[in-house]
């Protein structure tokens, strides 16, 4: 389990572009994208792109999930672009166009996101307004990053189907394979800490939102059988301050935007307009 999480089966950008729901997002792939490379604190280089929306001061940074690429965020980009936002996409550490490396399920990726936020502000102006949207591990990455962020830094967050902690997610995986969860979950946590150098709370959105004052919209599909809906429930309950939650009855994992597109757009657009 630890190996599968830290060394995921990667999808290529080319594969995701080919298999994307082009008919659902007409015109998005025609948007002009300005590529960027960002050298991080440890020398690692992150690849991404920006679709500027005229002179807009509103930016959305999109974070993709485990094993995916920035194309995994494309399905949300056009919705925000139509609302007047410039769109920033990037490949998470070890994914997409980046050099392969260990995935830490949000522990290091959350620090990367902070550097990307700073890069966007330094490039496009300290007066821009940044919001964040993530799905699955992308949502978890954002929520873990809130330990470094305040309401003055980020307008609001849209978190779609995050795990409450990798420990809980690992426990679900163990239970799904009919193994004793109460015995093996501590073993899983030990392996992640000793062999992969990742502490339990470093991979726990539920732990970090306890001090987060940024408004958050939590989304989850009721039919998500990969990251079960209770994960969002736990984070929602732990989060202090302003928060909202919506469950999509027909939504599967990270696919509510396709499983219930009209309702998804209605909920998100309404939230965005109320929090701009």
PLM feature spans:
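An N-terminal hydrophobic leader/cap segment in hydrolases
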Residues: 1-39, 49
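Short alpha-helix in the alpha/beta-hydrolase fold that links the catalytic acid
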Residues: 76, 214, 228-237
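Conserved alpha/beta-hydrolase
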Residues: 77-99
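Catalytic nucleophile-loop/oxyanion-hole region of alpha/beta-hydrolase
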Residues: 95-128
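Hydrolase active-site cap/lid region
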Residues: 144-198
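Short beta-strand/loop motif that positions the catalytic acidic residue
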Residues: 211-213, 218-220, 224
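Acidic catalytic loop of the alpha/beta-hydrolase fold
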Residues: 223-227, 254-255
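Catalytic histidine-centered segment of alpha/beta-hydrolase-like enzymes
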Residues: 251-265
């Amino acid at each position: 389990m630890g190996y599968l999480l830290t060394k995921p089966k990667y999808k290529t950008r080319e594969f995701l572009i080919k298999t994307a729901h082009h008919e659902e997002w007409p015109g998005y792939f025609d948007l002009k994208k300005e590529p960027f490379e960002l050298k991080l604190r440890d020398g690692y280089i992150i690849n991404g792109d920006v679709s500027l929306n005229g002179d807009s001061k509103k930016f959305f940074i999109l974070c993709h999930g485990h094993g995916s690429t920035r194309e995994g965020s494309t399905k949300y980009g056009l919705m925000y672009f139509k609302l007047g936002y410039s769109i920033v996409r990037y490949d998470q550490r070890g994914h997409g166009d980046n050099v392969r490396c260990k995935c830490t399920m949000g522990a290091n990726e959350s620090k990367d996101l902070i550097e990307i936020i700073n890069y966007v502000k330094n490039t496009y102006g300290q007066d821009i307004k940044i919001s964040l949207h993530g799905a699955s591990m992308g949502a978890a990455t954002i929520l873990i990053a809130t330990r470094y962020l305040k309401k003055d830094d980020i307008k609001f967050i849209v978190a779609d189907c995050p795990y409450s902690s990798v420990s809980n997610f690992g426990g679900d995986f163990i239970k799904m394979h009919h193994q004793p969860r109460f015995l093996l979950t501590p073993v899983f946590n030990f392996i992640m800490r000793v062999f992969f150098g990742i502490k339990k709370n470093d991979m726990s959105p539920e732990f970090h939102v306890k001090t987060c004052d940024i408004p958050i919209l939590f989304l989850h599909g009721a039919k998500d059988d990969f990251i079960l809906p209770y994960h969002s429930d736990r984070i929602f309950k732990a989060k202090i301050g302003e928060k909202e939650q919506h469950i999509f009855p027909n939504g599967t994992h990270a696919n509510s935007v396709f499983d219930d597109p009209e309702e998804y757009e209605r909920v998100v657009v309404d939230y965005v307009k109320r929090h701009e």
